[in-house]
Amino acid sequence: MLFRSEYDDHLFCMITMNHHPLHTDAWYAEQATQFGKNVVVGNLVYSLVLGMSVPDVSGAAIANLEIETLQHKRPTFHGDTIYAETRVLDKVESTSKNDRGIVSVETFGYNQRGEEVCYFRRKVMVPKREFAKPRQRPYDSPAG
């Protein structure tokens, strides 16, 4: 994911009511911060990294149960390209329903220099293989 412009970042700021000038005021960011330029809102970076993990990790999820840890490791700037990688840590069967389990994963977000910018762990409830429905792409229609 490439942060091409400030627009998406500023829109996210406004939608989430995060009006901190570090994200929205170029003069402030240049003059009054150690970064010298606007920083992309960390929760936007987290949301994008989470979104990148959905097709592989939780595309068939029944529910996201918990975010155990969320760490913003380094700032992300407009023009940065973000990549994501997820590792499965553990899986356990549900104690209440035999058709599902809980998968624990950790996801890393990296910038174009390979620097870690975001890290989180989460638990996802997923159907067991024998109960999972075939996944379809959202743009596939039954009509063909």
Q: Can you name each region flagged by the protein language model?
A:
Residues 1-66, 118, 128-144:
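Hot-dog-fold acyl-thioester-processing enzymes
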Residues 67-72:
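Short alpha-helix capping/helix-loop boundary micro-motifs
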Residues 36, 73-74:
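Short, surface-exposed secondary-structure edge patches
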Residues 76-81, 85-144:
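HotDog/MaoC-like acyl-thioester-processing domains
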